[in-house]
Every structure is written in C-alpha cells, then in structure tokens.
Amino acid sequence: MTYLEKVGEGSGRLALKYKFNWKTVVVIILVSILSMAGKVYYEWVNRVIPEELLPQAIERTTSVKSYRYHVGLKLKVNGDDRLLSKVKGERQNGQFHLQGEIAGQEVDVIYVNNKVYMKDAVSGRWMVNHGGDIFQQDLFMIEVNPVASLEYEALNNINYLGIEKGKVDAYVMEYTPVVVNQMLATYWRNFKYKVWIEKRFKRIFKLEVFADHKDVPQNGLHMQLILYDFNKKLNIQAPSTQ
C-alpha cells in the first residue's frame, strides 16, 4: 500500500469517528429556543408600564384597612433644615395612635370612638377630649393619615427608575403630581414625589416628597414616609384615664 493510500484510509476512519451528530445539534437548538422563550416570557410577565403601575399602586395603598408608619417632615428655611414633625403611628378604620414630636412638642395621642386621648408629658396622665375635631385640621393631616398625601388630581412626568433590590424588592418611580391634600396644596407647590412600590403586592411602602413654599420659593418642604404592616389587625384601645 502506497503512502497516499494509507493517508486516505486514515482520513476515512477519522471522518467516520467524527461523524456529524444531528441529534446533538437539534437538542442544542431546542434548548436555545426554550431559553430565549423563557426570557421573553419572563420579561413580558415582569414588564413595567409606569403609567399603569403608579395609579394602581396608589389605589392599593390608599384603600388598605390598616397600617403602621413612620413619617418625618422638615422645612428648609434660608438654607437650614428645621424639623417640623417626626412621628410613628398606627391607623385602623379611622382610629389611630401616634407618638413623637410635632412643632417641638412631644405628643402621644390616641383617637378611639370619636374621643381624643392626649398624654401629658409632665404628669404622664391621659387627658380625654370628647370630639376629635382638632385632628380634622389641616395641620395634623399628614401626621394622622399620611397616605392621604398620595391622593392626586393628576400624575405628571412619571419616570421609572428601575428595580431596587433589598429586604423588599421595589419598583422605583419619580413623578410630579397635582395634589389634593389641603394642607400640602395650601402652602406648597412644585411637588416632586419619589415612591418605592412593592414588587409583590404593588403597594407603596416608601415615599419621599419635595416641594417649594408658595410665597417664599427658596424655602421648601421635605417629607419622608415609611409604611408597613398593611391590613394587619391592630390593637388600638383607649387608655386608662384614672
């Protein structure tokens, strides 16, 4: 056998050894297609349409039966930040309990069955006021029912900022609303809202608000709100006045 014949015979055996495997190719193609289809489906299911998600999240948040919260309001006056209020509270079916500081005064207030119970900071005793009209005033609206600050007439300039990973994964958005809250609308303008929306339940659990004073634009308002324990059964009871 000549050298060329030996080479030809060896090449033939090599070709048979590495025969093209169509089954493997088909499997690879199918896996690629399924992977791509899964990715497309995932993106479709998790797609975010800000103009639809934001009003839905606001509606779901403002319609809860109960919640707990932390809220802080700061005023910016001549470049300096001044604390207006910092309270924590809980609210259920129109009844509430809040504790903290408002306008430099320590407060501990419970509102149950149209009665306001206010704890005296000096004696520690509870005083009762029949009729809760004082807490219908605009001054206390944010501290008493902070989700009311989410109510709006229009939502403008909605900007989706993406997903923020954390203890609670959240959709993050910014927008400029036309607010209906009387306290906010009376004294402030040029509102800028930033919200964190629970990815799972589509409710707002964190809110940040900036606004300019109507008469003195260089002065501003900064509000921070944390919401949690949505629709939990809360135990808000009247304290002993003895």
Predicted regions and their residues:
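Gly/Pro-enriched, hydrophobic low-complexity segments
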Residues: 168-242
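N-terminal leader/targeting segments and the immediate start of mature chains
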Residues: 2-95, 232-242
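An acidic-aromatic
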Residues: 88-143
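Flexible, processing/modification-adjacent segments and terminal tails
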Residues: 47, 119-185
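Beta-turn initiation residues at beta-strand->coil junctions
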Residues: 73-75, 100-103, 120-122, 208-213
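Short, surface-exposed coil-to-beta transition loops
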Residues: 81-86, 103-108, 112-113, 187-193, ...
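Extended lipid/amphipathic-ligand handling interfaces
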Residues: 56-59, 86-93, 109, 113-116, ...
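Extracytoplasmic
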Residues: 64-66, 93, 104, 111, ...
